[in-house]
């Protein structure tokens, strides 16, 4: 078959092997009816008792304002000249996490945390709401977990967080001109095995996904086996960044994509697309479906912590977003459902 370019012998053998192996699979059904012949997969949660306990603990105040926060609430040393700040970065981070988890404006947040300290007979006070707003612009928030070792599959994607604008109902009924709707774009990299967010970055809405991709990979020094993303990441810069990490790229080439230089890992996906007319069989062969874990993570961010940013300053929005990511990783650490396929 003429696929537009002479590929290496190794690539040709791989393509032929894929062709022979996949012809005997479920794709033997006609393209118009194979989906209807496949029943919807069913899964059973095997650790429901532990997961149910984790869901209950999500609302525990002592989980969010813990002993570490009590001990390091006030800042003792600043590391530079001048009077030290009264509240530590951990205090500001904790306040921002509580704000997102319990969906509170800043003033209500201050009263809420003060009441917690009062009920617990702890001689601490919450930072003033203006202090939280100001410190959010420069607070150092580390959302990385203590998990170590190689990452088998890292899934990368992006979603939008609304700053302000018309509600969805008004847009549905009357439409919008888009002038008063402001968004920020959240880029995340998720470990598909643990559901932990390994890297994250907030950008303006006009920044493309591919522009942020290399910066996400620079945020972790752990070894990565596979890195997946959608077609928006099918660029030279993204593939070069993956090559630096010595990982396997799982990025579907765009429709009508051309081969790159001889021996490039992307050529196998391009050849498969030209051979079968689409990327479907390539996705099945190499487990591209794992990328959906990144979409699950974005859904969890919006469902559990809200899809709208309340702080108006961009730098403060970055701090608020990183507090959301840290909170989500804490929720993930409590426990996730373990499922088993039911035949």
Feature names for model-found ranges:
Residues 2, 8, 12-81, 86, ...:
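Charged, often Cys/His-bearing segments associated with DNA-binding zinc-finger transcription factors
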Residues 5-6, 11, 315, 325:
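Short, low-complexity, intrinsically disordered N-terminal modules
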Residues 31, 36-41, 231-303:
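Helix-centered, glycine/charged polyanion-binding patches within enzymatic domains
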Residues 39, 89-93, 97-101, 279-343:
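Basic, amphipathic alpha-helical segments enriched in Lys/Arg and hydrophobic/aromatic residues
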Residues 48-50, 159, 251:
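Short polar catalytic/cofactor-binding loops
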Residues 77-93, 101-107, 111, 115, ...:
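Polybasic low-complexity intrinsically disordered regions
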Residues 120-123, 330:
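Short arginine-rich
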């Amino acid at each position: 078959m003429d696929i537009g370019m002479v590929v290496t012998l190794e690539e040709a053998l791989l393509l032929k092997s894929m062709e022979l192996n996949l012809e005997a699979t479920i794709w033997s059904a006609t393209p118009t009816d194979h989906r209807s012949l496949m029943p919807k997969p069913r899964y059973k949660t095997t650790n429901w008792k532990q997961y149910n306990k984790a869901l209950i603990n999500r609302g525990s105040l002592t989980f969010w304002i813990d002993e570490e926060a009590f001990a390091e609430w006030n800042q003792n040393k600043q590391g530079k000249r001048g009077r030290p700040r009264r509240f530590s970065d951990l205090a500001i981070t904790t306040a921002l996490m509580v704000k997102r988890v319990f969906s509170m404006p800043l003033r209500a947040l201050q009263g809420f945390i003060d009441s917690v300290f009062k009920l617990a007979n702890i001689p601490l006070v919450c930072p003033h709401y203006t202090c939280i707003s100001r410190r959010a612009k420069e607070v150092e928030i580390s959302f990385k977990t203590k998990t170590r070792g190689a990452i088998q599959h890292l899934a990368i994607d992006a979603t939008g967080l609304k700053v302000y604008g018309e509600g969805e109902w008004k847009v549905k009924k009357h439409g919008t001109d888009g002038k008063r709707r402001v968004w920020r774009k959240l880029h995340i990299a998720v470990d598909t095995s643990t559901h932990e967010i390994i890297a994250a970055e907030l950008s303006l809405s006009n920044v493309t996904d591919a522009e942020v991709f290399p910066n996400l990979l620079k945020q972790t020094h752990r070894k990565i086996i596979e890195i997946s993303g959608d077609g928006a990441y099918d660029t030279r810069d993204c593939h070069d960044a993956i090559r630096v990490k010595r990982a396997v790229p799982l990025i579907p080439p765009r429709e009508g994509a051309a081969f790159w230089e001889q021996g490039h890992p992307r050529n196998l996906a391009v050849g498969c697309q030209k051979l079968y007319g689409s990327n479907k069989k390539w996705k099945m062969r190499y487990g591209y479906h794992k990328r959906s874990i990144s979409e699950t993570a974005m859904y969890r961010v919006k469902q559990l912590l809200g899809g709208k940013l309340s702080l108006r300053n961009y730098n403060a929005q970055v701090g608020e977003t990183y507090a959301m990511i840290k909170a989500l990783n804490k929720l993930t650490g409590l426990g996730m459902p373990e499922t088993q396929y039911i035949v």
